[in-house]
């Protein structure tokens, strides 16, 4: 993640894949449940817009939930769960993704990397604990970056199209990400 992907984001805005001018809209489902329509734009402004309703609801009722639809990549979920933890809230964040992981012993990707993050508040606006991880051994972006840089990847990061571990990022991107923990 990070600035490395900024040129791609710009290309996706220029091509129309992302609406760079989208204005997210928050819909209140119940007093503690909200749905944000990102309108084809970036997830970050949609998440921030949703937090304007989510945080007061969580503080008032002790729990609240929010979903975001029609958005581009949320990138690092820990950034968002960290914001909530700094405000004294226990935060859980999840996202879906396209199939990128073959199950243990398999060849064909059928499971998404489905990133997840958990953040626990500390004292005085601090974060006590934060985890941000993918269901793959490493993020897809790490393999993609190695491919772009012409570097090998460590064994265990990805599988080739035959389901065999590979150190070749090109073969890994053609095959599958390795599942977290090997299973």
Where are the regions that the model predicts?
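A short, polar/proline- and glycine-enriched secondary-structure boundary/capping micro-motif
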Residues: 47, 140-144, 177-178
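Internal helical hairpin/lid segments
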Residues: 175-183
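A generic, well-ordered mixed alpha/beta core segment in the N-terminal half of proteins
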Residues: 33-123
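Phosphate/diphosphate-binding glycine-rich loops and adjacent basic-rich segments that engage nucleotide
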Residues: 101-172
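Short, flexible coil/turn micro-motifs enriched in small/turn-prone residues
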Residues: 11, 70-73, 100, 158, ...
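Active-site cofactor/substrate anionic-group-binding motifs, chiefly glycine-
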Residues: 2-55
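Generic, ordered loop/turn and secondary-structure boundary motif
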Residues: 4-7, 19, 37, 105, ...
């Amino acid at each position: 993640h990070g600035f490395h992907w900024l040129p791609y984001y710009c290309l996706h805005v220029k091509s129309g894949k992302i609406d760079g001018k989208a204005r997210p809209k928050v819909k209140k489902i119940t007093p503690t449940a909200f749905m944000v329509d990102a309108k084809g734009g970036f997830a970050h402004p949609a998440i921030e817009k949703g937090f304007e309703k989510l945080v007061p609801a969580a503080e008032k009722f002790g729990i609240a939930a929010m979903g975001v639809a029609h958005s581009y990549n949320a990138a690092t979920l820990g950034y968002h769960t960290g914001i909530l933890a700094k405000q004294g809230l226990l935060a859980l964040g999840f996202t879906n993704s396209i199939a990128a992981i073959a199950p243990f012993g398999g060849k064909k990707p059928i499971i998404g990397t489905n990133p997840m993050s958990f953040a626990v508040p500390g004292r005085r606006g601090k974060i006590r604990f934060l985890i941000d991880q993918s269901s793959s051994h490493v993020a897809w972006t790490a393999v993609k970056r190695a491919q772009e840089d012409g570097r090998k990847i460590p064994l265990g990061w990805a599988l080739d199209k035959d389901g065999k571990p590979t150190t070749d990022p090109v073969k890994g991107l053609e095959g599958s990400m390795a599942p977290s923990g090997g299973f």
